């Protein structure tokens, strides 16, 4: 629908999407928004910053806040991620707790559920991976927490996605649009480019060093965008480069394909020892 033809916004608000690490929050946000807005991989803690995805649903402006997964803090980075989640959660109109149907309700889910308000919502996700009886058992355990509504959903099959989207939109408070028409992602362009590059590395490197890698745009002009890829050890630099630079080249090609509206990319790998424990480095990276 052309933004000029859309009905005026009558409801608007923020929904903080929360859950433990690696339960499919980012995939769910993308499905609810109807587009690939946040980075997704099978690695825990793929999301390292809160990403606001704006979706128009009828006369409602639904802002989905994809938050980092909740895990025990073991370095400065993970401690900061936890504080970000708390801040986004406190500032949202609603919270949506995501529970993996395979994992079920564990200690982490019970901890998060204890903080939910009666107006919040829970969803059992990835239901395509388990039998229906398992889904119902997880749902029954969640229902012990008094919430506004409970859902089941599968990003792969699409089951439950439209129902959840419609409910979240209808539950928003009355209010005007929070963003200009056509804005789909509240994220600086340099941050978006760095996140796309990082996602491509996650896909290429699989289990080798996902948590030790960070990306940052160092310079931007009409002639090109330079992205610095940080690792913590010289041995990791060799992995990121690949034999004869093939991994780095493949990542650059794939990222450029997704970012074809942007200037040409240049990737440079730099060793920054223990950057996840350095407050100064995390500040520089905007984390």
Swiss-Prot record:
Molecular function via GO? GTP binding; GTPase activity; ribosomal small subunit binding; small ribosomal subunit rRNA binding
UniProt cross-references to CDD domains, sorted A to Z: Era, KH-II_Era
Among InterPro entries, the record links this protein to: G_ERA_dom, GTP-bd, GTPase_Era-like, KH_dom-like_a/b, KH_dom_type_2, KH_sf_prok-type, P-loop_NTPase, Small_GTP-bd
Family note? Belongs to the TRAFAC class TrmE-Era-EngA-EngB-Septin-like GTPase superfamily. Era GTPase family.
Task: List residues of the Era-type G domain.
Answer: 11-174
Transmembrane regions listed in the UniProt entry: none
User: How would you describe this protein's topology in the membrane?
Assistant: Peripheral membrane protein
UniProt GO cellular component terms: cytoplasm; plasma membrane
Species for this entry: Acidimicrobium ferrooxidans (strain DSM 10331 / JCM 15462 / NBRC 103882 / ICP)
Q: What is known about what this protein does?
A: An essential GTPase that binds both GDP and GTP, with rapid nucleotide exchange. Plays a role in 16S rRNA processing and 30S ribosomal subunit biogenesis and possibly also in cell cycle regulation and energy metabolism.
Residues annotated as binding GTP are 19-26, 66-70
Can you cite a GO biological process for this protein?
ribosomal small subunit assembly
Q: Name the lineage.
A: Bacteria, Bacillati, Actinomycetota, Acidimicrobiia, Acidimicrobiales
| Residue intervals of the KH type-2 domain | 205-273
Q: Which HAMAP family match?
A: GTPase_Era
This protein's assembly is summarised as: Monomer.
Annotated localization: Cytoplasm; Cell membrane
Keywords of this protein's UniProt record, alphabetized?
Cell membrane, Cytoplasm, GTP-binding, Membrane, Nucleotide-binding, Ribosome biogenesis, RNA-binding, rRNA-binding
Q: NCBIfam families given for it?
A: era (TIGR00436), small_GTP (TIGR00231)
Q: What is its main location?
A: cytoplasm
Q: What is the official name of this protein in its record? A: GTPase Era
């Amino acid at each position: 629908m052309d933004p000029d033809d859309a009905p005026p916004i009558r409801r608007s608000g923020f929904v903080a999407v929360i859950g433990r690490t690696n339960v499919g929050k980012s995939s769910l946000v993308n499905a609810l928004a109807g587009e690939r807005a946040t980075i997704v991989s099978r690695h825990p803690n793929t999301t390292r910053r809160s990403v606001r995805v704006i979706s128009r649903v009828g006369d409602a402006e639904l802002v989905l806040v994809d938050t980092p997964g909740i895990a025990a803090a073991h370095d400065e980075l993970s401690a900061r991620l936890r504080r970000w989640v708390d801040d986004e959660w406190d500032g949202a109109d609603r919270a949506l707790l995501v529970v993996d149907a395979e994992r079920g309700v564990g200690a982490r889910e019970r901890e998060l559920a204890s903080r939910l308000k009666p107006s919040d919502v829970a969803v059992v996700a990835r239901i395509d991976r388990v039998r229906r009886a398992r889904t119902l058992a997880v749902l029954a355990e969640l229902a012990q927490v008094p919430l506004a509504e409970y859902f089941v959903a599968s990003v792969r099959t699409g089951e439950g996605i439209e129902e959840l989207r419609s409910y979240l939109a209808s539950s928003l408070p009355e209010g005007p649009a929070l963003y200009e028409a056509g804005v789909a992602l509240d994220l600086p362009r340099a941050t978006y480019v760095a996140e796309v590059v990082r996602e491509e590395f996650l896909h290429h490197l699989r289990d080798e060093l996902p948590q030790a890698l960070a990306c940052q745009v160092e310079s931007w002009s009409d002639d090109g965008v330079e992205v610095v890829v940080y690792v913590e050890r010289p041995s990791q630099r060799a992995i990121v480069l690949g034999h004869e630079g093939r991994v780095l080249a493949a990542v650059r090609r794939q990222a450029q394909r997704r970012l074809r509206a942007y200037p040409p990319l240049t990737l440079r790998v730099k060793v920054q020892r223990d950057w996840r424990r350095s407050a100064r480095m995390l500040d520089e990276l905007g984390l």
